[in-house]
Regions:
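Charge-dense, intrinsically disordered terminal/linker segments
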Residues: 1-126
Length: 126
């Protein structure tokens, strides 16, 4: 897996300061690319991979896009997200709850809900 510095060397194709990781644009803001996510690229059984699996939730009356793959997920919850990424199956409420709590915490610190360079990757849940 590449280091954050190696990832930062990627070509900028989007808004100023946005690094293109090759995952396509965000659904709610096509000027911003999807990033690597807190766990990096997670392989799926279909040969593809997931990095963020974004969801939208309401924060203070605004619809906010955020990753459902967050460091507070346990192994079972991460498995549900991976299945949803492959099949479109619904996510359990616990994933939405943790995604929302994680996003609110990061926003309160002036951070994006999403992983950003130069953050380190989070170890996978066991």
């Amino acid at each position: 897996m590449p280091s954050p510095k190696e990832l930062a060397a990627g070509l900028i194709k989007y808004a100023p300061g946005a690094v293109d990781f090759g995952h396509g644009p965000r659904f709610d803001n096509p000027d911003q690319p999807k990033a690597e996510g807190f766990f990096g690229r997670i392989p799926l059984s279909n040969g593809d991979y997931a990095t963020e699996y974004s969801v939208s939730q309401n924060i203070d009356g605004k619809n906010v896009e955020m990753p459902s793959i967050v460091p507070t997920l346990n192994k079972e919850e991460l498995g549900h997200v991976m299945r949803a990424a492959e099949t479109g199956s619904p996510l359990p409420n616990s994933v939405y709850d943790k995604s929302l709590a994680h996003a609110k915490d990061r926003i309160s610190k002036g951070q994006s809900p999403f992983w950003q360079i130069p953050e380190s990757y989070t170890p996978m849940p066991k």
